[in-house]
Swiss-Prot record:
InterPro entries: Alkaline_phosphatase_core_sf, PEA_transferase, Sulfatase_N. One of its GO terms (molecular function) is phosphotransferase activity, phosphate group as acceptor. This is Putative transferase YhbX. Belongs to the phosphoethanolamine transferase family. Residues 82-110, 163-264 are cytoplasmic. Coiled coil: none annotated. One of its GO terms (cellular component) is plasma membrane. PANTHER family: INNER MEMBRANE PROTEIN, PHOSPHOETHANOLAMINE TRANSFERASE OPGE-RELATED. Probably does not transfer phosphoethanolamine to lipid A. It is a multi-pass membrane protein. Its main location: membrane. GO terms for biological process: lipopolysaccharide core region biosynthetic process. Residues 1-60, 132-141, 286-541 are periplasmic.
Length: 541
């Protein structure tokens, strides 16, 4: 019998096993990191061979279940990240997953259906291979010893890596050891969740840190500052910026009271990083969560302000997330469950509190977060059909505009000001099942270009700056902008809005979902253009 005939006979007998290996290999090479691919493939194959030689069916299933489910989940996550964002899964995505609340996950299930199907298919495929006891395969002793060698070698390499890391950082981290070991296994993406867990623990350790600032407090003539942070808002869908549909009539009606930023850009295309960049001393080029305690809430508290944080983003996992590490420093925090309009009664209550203190009231909106069709009451829809994704997204913008109009109404007779900006934009590709989505690797300008303006009450008269700002201004410098807006600054930073804008305008550096730094100006304008700025053929965006 020739070698080819032997191979053909073996392939015929074990074709399902070969199929599993091929699917695992291709998926990991294309949609995941190719790092340590040999070890991962050996780990995968040898584990299957060991399990297939367990004679007891209940025991075989008991051992197989966690292996099958974890491997299928890992591959499905890789496919989702690659197909949706054009990048491999990373610790930034892992942090976003860990910070997602159950309500948000349920709302977004429709976006995940193809990948849930992939998870089910892969689970069944791997289970179909493992479930059959096969005496024709090498014995457990042989495959078990080989698997033990692979695991031992991987663990040794991981320990070496963790030791070098501990030597450099003067501290051992079990998360680094776990993360490194995961890269040698079929559960590669667990390494990112280990890194995210490490970040979570670091954040917990510094969340209660309240630095002391040398402050300069200047009277701006404003008593009430309302900071509104929008979510996933595209400038291209706002009539305030020239969009054809009337999505922002309330803000446009206040145009004479507004200082508009035409080219505001977010520092990052996802909330977990973009909001801390905007509200703390953290920066695009020197990202470090130890910068988070240097934030607008702690500054306002020390300056004698009464501070409030009102959020319609779920209170789930309130401790140990980047945004909540800032929010928790406010004197009063409120989390509502439902639409953004539920924040208005709490805003009214905050305004009615009799105090001689100035007030900083932060409203963190759900805004236009995907799926946009769930971001507003159906009774508030003005664009049809309501199941069209473009109509839904425009309705979510219109709903936020309505809320802003109500905020202006509450503040029009007060010495008050409102600053509004969105945490980041969104990509748009009409050829995709989910037309709107977060920016990924080398995102387009649409993922960063955000609305931003400062509204001044008519009571303040003409003594405030309402001129339009046409230069690029990154919200990564909003920490300084907000400080100057409140009149609460440190000696080393610009003291007025004009000085902040003059100092930081034109800085167009941004970070993508892969933590790479890019010049916003050099990015393609739209997702449906290729990296050189040319339109992509229909259906290939």
């Amino acid at each position: 019998m020739t070698v080819f005939n032997k191979f053909a006979r073996t392939f015929k007998s074990h074709w399902l096993l070969y199929l599993c290996v091929i699917v695992f290999g291709i998926t990991n090479l294309v949609a995941s990191s190719g790092a340590h691919m040999v070890q991962r493939l050996l780990f995968f194959v040898l584990t299957i061979l060991v399990v297939k030689r367990i004679s007891s069916l209940p025991l075989r299933l008991l051992v197989a279940a966690p292996f099958v489910l974890l491997t299928a989940a890992d591959m499905s996550i890789s496919l989702y990240s690659w197909c949706t964002f054009g990048t491999t899964f990373n610790d930034g995505f892992a942090i976003s997953v860990l910070q997602s609340d159950p309500d948000e996950v349920v709302k977004m299930l429709g976006m995940y259906i193809p990948y849930l199907c992939a998870f089910a298919f892969l689970s069944l495929l791997f289970l179909a291979v493992i479930i059959k006891y096969d005496v024709s395969l090498p014995t457990k002793k042989v495959t078990g010893i080989l698997l033990l060698i692979v695991i031992s070698g991987s663990l040794f390499s991981a320990c070496q890596f963790a030791y070098k890391d501990a030597k450099n950082k003067k501290a051992f981290s079990p998360y680094i050891l776990a993360s490194r070991f995961a890269t040698y296994t079929p559960f590669f993406n667990l390494n990112y969740f280990a890194l995210a867990a490490k970040e979570h623990q670091r954040l917990l350790s510094i969340a209660n840190t309240v630095p002391y600032f040398q402050l300069s407090v200047r009277d701006t003539g404003i008593d009430t500052y309302v900071l509104i942070v929008g979510e996933s808002v595209r400038v291209d869908n706002m009539s305030l910026y020239g969009y054809t549909r009337s999505t922002t009539p309330q803000v446009e009606a206040q145009r004479k009271q507004i200082k508009l930023f035409n080219q505001a850009i977010s520092g990052a295309p996802y909330t977990a990083l973009s909001v801390p960049l905007s509200l703390t001393a953290d920066s695009v080029l020197s990202h470090d969560i130890h910068n988070y305690p240097d934030n607008i809430i702690n500054m306002a508290n020390q300056a004698g302000f009464q501070t409030f944080w009102l959020s319609s983003q779920s209170a789930f996992r309130q401790n140990g997330t980047a945004v909540t590490s800032i929010a928790m420093r406010a004197m009063e925090t409120v989390y509502v469950r439902g639409f953004d309009e539920l924040l208005l009664p709490h805003l009214s209550q905050a305004l009615q509190q009799n105090t001689q203190q100035k007030k900083l009231i932060v409203l963190h909106l759900n805004g236009s977060h995907e799926p946009a069709c769930s971001a507003y009451p159906q009774s508030s829809a003005v664009f049809q059909p309501q199941d069209d994704q473009d109509a839904c997204y425009d309705n979510s913008i219109h709903y936020t505009d309505s809320l802003l109009g109500q905020v202006f109404e509450l503040l029009k007779d007060r010495r008050a000001s409102v600053m509004y900006f969105a945490d980041h934009g969104l990509e748009r590709d009409p050829t995709k099942k989910n037309v709107y989505f977060h920016g990924g690797r080398e995102a387009s300008q649409q993922a960063y270009h955000v609305p931003m303006f400062i509204w001044y009450s008519p009571v303040l008269g003409d003594g405030v700056d309402r001129t339009t700002e046409n230069n690029i201004f990154s919200t990564a410098y909003n920490n300084y902008l907000i400080n100057a807006w409140m009149g609460v600054t440190k000696p080393e930073q610009p003291q007025t809005l004009e000085e902040v804008i003059a100092h930081y305008k034109g800085d167009s550096r941004v970070v993508d979902a892969n933590h790479d730094v890019f010049d916003y100006v050099m990015l393609r304008k739209e997702f449906t253009e290729d990296k050189q700025g040319n339109p992509t053929p229909e259906g290939q965006g």
